[in-house]
């Protein structure tokens, strides 16, 4: 089980100088709104994937009146602790270092530091467009399917080139030149996603039964083009409309994973709190599948766990996370709202300062 053995954060949001030793299992950060609780979780997330889960404007992550931020951890990988850190300045330059060496790609950090992030807006998983749900599936494949990332990268390149040709209204031959590569990688990506969904669904059902036994939701995977046609046939059928719109309408970039109860979308039936529990069930099942396939448990970041959940559901979440045998970082306002297990560390966050209790 990977876990963070130490965490240092400098000049990130309102965190001027944080240096803590997290517990290898449960860590609960409490304090008033604006104290910096979420920023702790956000800093770990940024180190893993190179972006924030709160803003698309990275300059906002740098503390006021400073010119850079630094995030540094020591990460236990099962045999030893390795250093992992990132520095970003106000000009947009950033440096990621893993085990003392500059990393060429953020995918190297994501591989070493697998995270499942559950933010205060997690219920939006069901409400937002399909992109977030594709990312959910692709996270799994990135960690369990060795061939996924190279396939995904090639697909993005061919799709970008085809869309540029469509937008520029180039001759048909220059547009369809990209179809063969797009189809080859698109079909392979679809098959990987389909395989992952098949393995994932029973685990999701198992998790959902713990949270919402009265709501037997069903997951449906849509590959991104009609079941009646191959991807090549669909591209040929859509070519005229693609030219009019300036982009490729069909393909794995349009895939989705939707949840229904009977014939109705889950988001039309469930309350906001129930949607939050569904998202928890999805991500806990995600972690279970990762552990089944690789023996590695992800680290969980759970922001504002108590919000919209009654005491029984909060306890249920804690019990399930405990069974996952993962390191967990949880935030909330009141420590009395969470029944933490004995193997926990409580941190008080106030005005950007963090102290273990």
Curated annotation (Swiss-Prot):
Name the record gives this protein: DNA replication and repair protein RecF
Binding site for ATP: 31-38
GO terms for biological process, alphabetical: DNA replication; DNA synthesis involved in DNA repair; double-strand break repair; SOS response
Species of provenance: Coxiella burnetii (strain RSA 493 / Nine Mile phase I)
DNA damage keyword on record: yes
Purpose of the protein: The RecF protein is involved in DNA metabolism; it is required for DNA replication and normal SOS inducibility. RecF binds preferentially to single-stranded, linear DNA. It also seems to bind ATP.
GO cellular component, one term: cytoplasm
Pfam families associated with the record: SMC_N
Cell location: Cytoplasm
Main location: cytoplasm
PANTHER family xrefs: DNA REPLICATION AND REPAIR PROTEIN RECF (PTHR32182:SF0)
Family: Belongs to the RecF family.
Matches recorded under PROSITE patterns: RECF_1 (PS00617), RECF_2 (PS00618)
